[in-house]
Structure formats: structure tokens, C-alpha cells
Amino acid sequence: MELKKYEELLISNIKALMSVDSPSGFTHNATELVKKMVTDLGYKCTQNNLGNVVVEVEGEDDTAPLGMSAHLDTLGLMVRSIKPNGDLAFTVVGSPVTPSLDGEYCRIYTREGKVYEGTVISETPAKHVFKDANTHPREAENMVIRLDEVVRSKEDVVKLGIAAGDFVCYDPKTTFTSSGFLKSRFIDDKACAGIFITLLTIFKELGIKPKHKTYLCFSVHEEIGYGGATLPKDMKELLVVDMGCIGDDLNCRETDVSICAKDSSGPYDYDMTTMLVELSKKHNLPYVTDIYPMYSSDAIAAWRAGHDVRCALIGPGVAASHGMERTHIQGLMATVELILHYIQ
């Protein structure tokens, strides 16, 4: 299947999604963007009460609908309190690798619609002042947000309209290299959401019609555990498209599409997983099968919510997950191709 001409489109779609802040609980701007991108391509979509966006793609048969899920929500931070000197204490949204946040530029969104800039730093950031500047723990309770405003006290910050509960979003720093690497935060899972948007174009331009009615689902609470809980109830199968794990004794690299046999919640559907392996072999895709030791997905949330659905999990290999992540266009396009073979 010749798909190389869609690489630039995929890159463009990923960049567009990365440009919009969307930590779990603060995804409205991202869902509005996705709805516009989808409708501009001529598709209809719906959005449920919790915010998931679902695109229904007509199939040759509508008696056994398939679902595919990628999540729009990302990791983030939230203001916990204002310190006496005007720095902000924060709590994490999801599970970022907090030491990797030291020095990150960020935006603070107030409930009145104001946006302020700042930097995530250690409590002891100055090498010329603090003996433990190098060794001070980099956890949420040992770090602060330094506002880029002239503030000297808690009262100064309150006057700006900043309060506990305000979302804090840090820069993804999205970069595509000439060698094909995507370096960015939030590749998990905006890269796969970008794959879904690209698939909709491929369906149109190549005249591809899925064998079964297919729901493309953009979930918005995956990073906090219940993204898949409110996906369509009539799905017979759910293919979760999320990042593949890299590291330790795992097989995956950034250039692969990873097929997950089991994560920390248990095995995925045996028959679906076997079919995905066989499709990868048949079409000579760069694939691996792996066990993800500390991982959960929209499939687990769907099962725990009582969905009677078979589930499998695939995705491009992503290094340094929940930190400064990296994948490769080869792994991304292999994921695209495996999905296309799966739905047909």
C-alpha cells in the first residue's frame, strides 16, 4: 500500500493538535479543533457529555461495528496554592516524569480567561546560592511555578486572578527532524489522534470503505483512567491506538508499530492480537509484540465500565514516555498501514 504521500499531511495534523493545550479536564479547545478538522473533511461527528468526540465512518456492513480510540488529553499541572513569595505550588494532572519538567516554560489559564506565562523550576534552582541545586528532589512538592509577572507576594498573585484549581500547561516543544524523528511531549497520544485525522483523508482520497461501520473515537480522559468508559456501547471490537513502549527488555523501537499482548491490567484479546500480528507479517510491516509493564489504556476503562467488547492495542514506538518523548515517521506510518489492513 503506497502511503508515502500522506507523511507530510500526518506531520501537519500532529503539529496542529500539538499547538493546542489539552491536559485531562481542560480539553475543550482540542475537541473544538478536532470537530472542525473532521467536518472540514466532510464527516459528521458527535460529542458526548464527558467530551469524547466520535466520528462514524460508514462500512459495508453495520451489524458489527468496530471502534478505534486515540486520546486527545495530555498530562499537565494545576495550581495547588500560592506561596507567600508569589511562586505557585502545583499538583500534577496524570503522571508526568516530574524531573523532566525542571526548566519548562508553561502557561497558567485562569477561570476568567486570562493566560499568564511562567517556568517550572526547583525550589533551589540557583547554582550560585544553593548547595543542593543539583541534588534537590524534582517532585511536585519540591518544585514551583515561577510567574513571569512582577509579583512579590501572594496578594500580588491573587490580584492577577490566579487561584487554586487553575490549569497549567507546559510546552510540548514539537520538532520533526530531517531524519524522520518526531520529538515532543504529548506524542502520547496526539500522534495517534493525528493518525485518525489522516485516515479520514485517506478514506476519501483512496475510496476506502471499512468492512464494518467504524467509530473513530477521540477520548479525553485517558490519562486519568476513564477515557474509554463512555465509548459507543454497540462496538463489537475496540482497537486502541496509543503509544508503544520502549525500554528495558522490550522489543520496540521508534521505527516500529508495537502490538501489545498484555499491560499491567492483563492480556488483550487473543484473537484480535493474533490477527494484528498476522496482518503485520503478511504486509511486511516493521512490527513487534511486547508486554507493557506499567500501562493502562482506553480498553481497560471500557472493560471496567462494563463494555462487552473485544479489545486490542497498537501504536508507534515512543521513547521516554511521559517525559521528552520521541517517535519516528516510519513507526507512525506503519501504524497507519496496519489500521488500514485491519478495517478491511
State the predicted function of each range.
Residues 1-344:
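N-terminal hydrophobic/helix-forming segments and targeting peptides
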